[in-house]
From Swiss-Prot:
Mode of membrane association: Lipid-anchor
GO MF terms, alphabetically ordered: cytoskeletal motor activity
InterPro entries named in the record: Flag_Lring (IPR000527)
Name assigned to this protein: Flagellar L-ring protein
Keywords: Bacterial flagellum, Cell outer membrane, Lipoprotein, Membrane, Palmitate, Signal
Higher taxonomy: Bacteria, Pseudomonadati, Pseudomonadota, Gammaproteobacteria, Enterobacterales
Subunit structure of this chain's protein: The basal body constitutes a major portion of the flagellar organelle and consists of four rings (L,P,S, and M) mounted on a central rod.
Biological process annotations from GO: bacterial-type flagellum-dependent cell motility
Organism, as annotated: Shigella boydii serotype 18 (strain CDC 3083-94 / BS512)
Amino acid sequence: MQKNAAHTYAISSLLVLSLTGCAWIPSTPLVQGATSAQPVPGPTPVANGSIFQSAQPINYGYQPLFEDRRPRNIGDTLTIVLQENVSASKSSSVNASRDGKTNFGFDTVPRYLQGLFGNARADVEASGGNTFNGKGGANASNTFSGTLTVTVDQVLVNGNLHVVGEKQIAINQGTEFIRFSGVVNPRTISGSNTVSSTQVVDARIEYVGNGYINEAQNMGWLQRFFLNLSPM
């Protein structure tokens, strides 16, 4: 008796664990890796006894006199103005119909069918029809606005800057995360050290959160289980 109870308990535990796994939906973050970068010190030049040196160390505190200071090195900051407004709509409809009719007769009925048709002429008629109507439509709209300051984590060979950044906002018992990454052309950076997100190449914008509000939006494990099994 105890052996059967232990066996039943083990099966029930495995079933509960498998059902719990149905509740978790894995998600891959759009922005992966570190969301900040530290300035990289350049190599120390070797003094050659001349006024003009072959290499000069990077001076991160350099302030241009006749030009705006713009990010150009790893660790420099840049403000991204989020101006995303995307909308899409799609509709489709289809109609199909088909009708058919067949008519044929027998002048002479075989003897073994006379009980069914009689001795007179037998006529057979068949008709059929098929009609199909279908309609579909979809609408989507997405608006994202705000600002986020990011850091240059890579300077590409052609001079473009790969930037990445994150902003965390704690509200009551939940935390909101805004992450951004992309490639910026230095020519699109304004004098106020800002660039619109619409001018960023390969932009990745992610807005997620955690806490009880985010957990309330997740489907329960039992409901998720029946959703996976339901054919409807």
